[in-house]
A protein has these predicted regions:
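Short, hydrophobic/aromatic-rich segments at coil-to-beta transitions
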Residues: 219-223
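Rossmann-like dinucleotide/flavin-binding elements
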Residues: 1-31, 35, 70-84, 92-103, ...
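Catalytic cores of secreted or luminal carbohydrate-active enzymes
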Residues: 87
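N-terminal Rossmann-like dinucleotide/flavin-binding domain of flavoprotein oxidoreductases
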Residues: 35-83, 183, 188-213
């Protein structure tokens, strides 16, 4: 069957690979100039760099299975109809959820994805949202300006600084980071096998964690929060939003009745861990 996969993130790449391995004629459209989707953000926090190998794996596997990958292709209902596929797999991912509180002008406000992509930030940063994304973003930002491994090796080999000084430089960056969460605990959606590592990084890097704090608004003064009945303002140069994600599936409505078969997978169905998205892409092939 002629299968069109729209979206080159984890779910889309696996669906395309698995479908092609079963003999289907598969084309994958990705609007960006590279495959991987949100996997590229996942590689930024400390200890996560190896996730980029997953993108390399799929790039090789898709080519090996004969999948036609078209980068820079923005999918529209008209383009899909003209392509005339037997099956469309919508794996268009998610977008950051809007903030559930007012944001006034006067302060830099960016999403966690923008922060992980390297957007410039000020020296005082407040990350709002203590889930997995917020915790890992806080760690990545707090790492800014810390000594890298090769520099530490040089200093130790040449006895250029005392061990205590080196340890301080490794554990303290150039950013003052505060993480705000309305629940009693942070990292509730982080797997038990890795949660302790993230917690240790937050502590090591001196991230100020504020739980059971409700954000009231963001304005030029900073982040206004309510905690235990008291209100306070957290000064900030940059506010980073990590308040969840919403599916991107507008195309599904436009394609209604225009294609013989339509499947929605991954974050486009509902935001989830990338491992779950990959599994869904694999399982889908049984239905084709």
């Amino acid at each position: 069957r002629k299968v069109l996969v729209i979206g080159g993130g984890p779910a889309g790449m696996e669906a395309a690979r698995a479908a092609a391995s079963r003999g289907h004629r598969v084309t994958l459209w990705e609007k960006d100039s590279r495959l991987g989707g949100q996997l590229h953000y996942a590689t930024v926090p400390p200890g996560k760099r190896e996730f980029i190998n997953l993108v390399d794996y799929y790039t090789h596997s898709l080519a090996e299975e004969g999948v036609e990958v078209v980068l820079g292709q923005e999918a529209t209902a008209e383009k899909v109809a003209a392509f005339n596929p037997d099956v469309v797999v919508l794996a268009t991912g998610s977008r950051p959820a809007p903030a559930p509180f007012p944001i006034q002008p006067g302060l830099q406000v960016i999403t966690a994805r923008e922060a992980l992509a390297g957007a410039p930030t000020g020296s005082r940063i407040v990350v709002i949202g203590g889930g997995a994304v917020g915790c890992e973003t806080a760690v990545a930002l707090a790492e800014t300006g810390t000594l890298k491994a090769e520099v530490v090796k040089f200093l130790i080999e040449n006895e250029a600084e005392s061990f205590e000084t080196i340890r301080e430089l490794v554990n303290r960056g150039t950013k003052e980071v505060t993480l705000v969460e309305m629940e009693a605990k942070i990292g509730r959606d982080i797997g038990i096998s890795t949660r302790w590592v993230i917690m240790k990084h937050l502590q090591r890097l001196g991230v100020n964690v504020m739980t059971q704090a409700r954000v009231l608004q963001v304005d030029a003064q900073g982040v206004h929060v309510e905690k235990e009945g008291n209100t306070m303002v957290l000064p900030a140069d940059t506010v980073v939003l990590a308040v969840g994600a919403v599916p991107v599936r507008d195309l599904a409505e436009e394609l209604g009745g225009k294609v013989p078969e339509l499947h929605i997978i991954g974050d486009a169905h509902s935001p989830r861990k990338f491992t779950e998205a990959i599994r869904e892409g694999f399982d889908l092939v049984r239905q084709l």
